[in-house]
Amino acid sequence: MQSSEPAVILPMNHPDSRIPSDASAPVETLHVGKWLSLRKRGRWEYAERNNPGGAVIILAVTPEDKVLFVEQYRVSILKHTIEMPAGLVGDLHEHGDEDAMLAAGRELEEETGYRCGRLEFVHEGPSSSGMSTEMIAFVRAWDLVKVGPGGGDESENIIVHEVPRTQAGEWLFARAAEGYSIDPKLFAGLWFIEHTGEKARS
């Protein structure tokens, strides 16, 4: 027996009309590594970090009005990169209960040697929504004080760069011309630096 109710046809601009038909398919696990897992939902394959906390990028400007960047070699792309201080939230057993704000303070000091007086959440979004479930939070660090050398943990070899805020964009393009890989999120980070805080809101 057919229903007498008419079929519901959603307009093309309705959000639900653009959701793929297999978006609610069961999730299959294709591979589990130490840090990453490969999943499949319907026809879609994507990576998922094994730590559930996501990642955090720290927007840090020194009292001398210099933006903190970090340089390190990334094996996945076989290049030296320029990034902002960043790290995973709750990636180690002893940090399992931390949130993005705690992770931001820890990673800032670990990578750059600076400790901050306070932290401000700015924004959160996907790092690469077409291939990963990872979400990244941007956190602004305030009232920085130098307390150590930085350089990262024993598995990292990080070089810290302190760049005058007004020259940061130009400096990044110069590093790109030298062959460094520049994380595009840095330019979003510089925009957030200019548009967050009391000075930006005044």
Predicted region positions:
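Acidic, metal-coordinating catalytic segment for phosphate/diphosphate chemistry
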Residues: 22-64, 72
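Conserved Nudix-box catalytic region and its N-terminal flanking loop in Nudix hydrolases
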Residues: 49-53, 57-62, 66-106, 147-148, ...
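A short coil-to-beta-strand element that immediately follows conserved catalytic motifs
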Residues: 115-122
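Acidic pyrophosphate-coordinating catalytic loop
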Residues: 29-34, 49, 75, 125-136
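Nudix hydrolase/Nudix homology domain
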Residues: 7-13, 18-22, 80, 121, ...
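Conserved hydrophobic/aromatic beta-strand scaffold that supports enzyme active sites
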Residues: 38-40, 59, 69, 138-140, ...
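Active-site-adjacent beta-strand/loop module that shapes the phosphate/pyrophosphate-binding cleft
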Residues: 39-40, 128-147
